[in-house]
Amino acid sequence: NINNNAGSTHIEGLQKLVVEKGLDVGFAYDGDADRCLCVDEKGNVITGDHILYIYGCYMKERGKLLNNTVVTTVMSNFGLYKAFDEQGIGYAKTAVGDKYVYEYMAKNGCRIGGEQSGHIIFSKYASTGDGILTSLKMMEVMMARKAKMSQLTEGLTIYPQVLENVRVVDKTAAQEDPDVKAAVKAVEEALGDTGRILVRESGT
């Protein structure tokens, strides 16, 4: 395992290093470096949702956010959509998987999209995630705005998010079950516009 206790899935060591050394930012990649997460100067983890917010706002300010749209997946945090609404930025939601993100981008002429996990696609340069490119783009924004990474995320509040995996015999049948549908509807009504519930089949 080339990323044993390291990389984007074990970012604790990077958080500690950034704070101890007084660094401006840190970047963590997965094994093939198509995913990138960041650590700000305070040691906070900057997820793919943060990155989409930062660069989406940056592109909008410069009139380069084609179709005024950032492409996300259904797994993005509810707070990201609230922040986009406040900034007047449109968004699209695709199924989970960077291939679905890129398919939407290609069909609709969008320039930026990605996943919470750190797969970020800049379609002007690539058709898939590129961790090194994502790092460069984040530093570009920091330099252009003369701002710390933590300042770039101030307009984004990440809502509490809980992921639960439930084993079932038949994934499709479980989602179509009347009791499951009723339970989901009840939660949606209780949350209103303050949160959301997502029930989906796992791809594995």
State what each model feature region is.
Residues A144-T204:
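Catalytic-core signal marking the mid-to-C-terminal active-site face
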Residues N1-R145, I158:
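Phosphate-binding chemistry for phosphorylated carbohydrates and sugar-nucleotides
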